[in-house]
Amino acid sequence: MLKTITAFLVTLIVASSAWAIDGAQLLIQVDRNLNPESYEMYRKLINVEPDGSKKEYTLFSVKKGQDKIAALFLAPASEKGRSTLRLGDNMWLYIPNVGKPIRITSLQSVVGGVFNNADILSLDYSAEYNVEKADESGKEHLLFLKAKTREVAYDRLKMWIDKSKSLPTKIECLTEANMLIKTLYFKDMKDFGGGLTRPSVIETDSPLYKGYKSIMIFARIKKKDFKDEIFTLTFMPNMESLRK
């Protein structure tokens, strides 16, 4: 009887380990299906007010590896030339003619609206989160993610993933106590070329900002390698040169 119980427990442990490994591998696959590890990107951010009024921003972004990303504001004219840089958990904002780049935090937002700096300068999910649990939900996988450090913007994520595409359809961003902060909706599949087909639109809303909505529209994503020197404070004023 004892041998039977022991064998059963071993089976459970092995099965649990298999789930964890599968979940971790799936999360890495989701990262690569969303973006190449290093890329250049053009996108538009739209903030929608409760009265329907909108404010739009156009950004050019570059990323290298799992923890380096920078973005340059192209529009509106009032923001043109501003740039942001993220190295791991550290973020900076450069404003032309103001001086040195200033530190910003992940929960602030350089554009206002529901998207915060962590959303705008997003890293690979697998770089910031561990998979606590993996479930099935009809035609979707459901991953329960836990932040690796306290510096990550959201302590927990619930990620619904299309089984056929290994791409997210919805992500709930939660506090440690599982209070909902915001929900991300992934929409409108698009072929970006180079073997990359992914949602071209991410919409977000939040119970903390009732009536507000923010939308991220991806126009171009292209695999491209960059030198490390691009992801430095001294290069922030020169990001426009990457577009030439």
Features from the language model and the residues they span:
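Gly/Pro-enriched, hydrophobic low-complexity segments
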Residues: 138-233
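N-terminal, post-signal-peptide region of Sec/Tat-exported proteins
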Residues: 42-78
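Positively charged n-region of N-terminal signal peptides that target proteins for export
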Residues: 1-5
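Bacterial N-terminal signal peptides
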Residues: 7-16
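Broad, structure-driven detector of short, well-ordered beta-strand segments within folded domains
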Residues: 60-62, 82-86, 157-159, 216
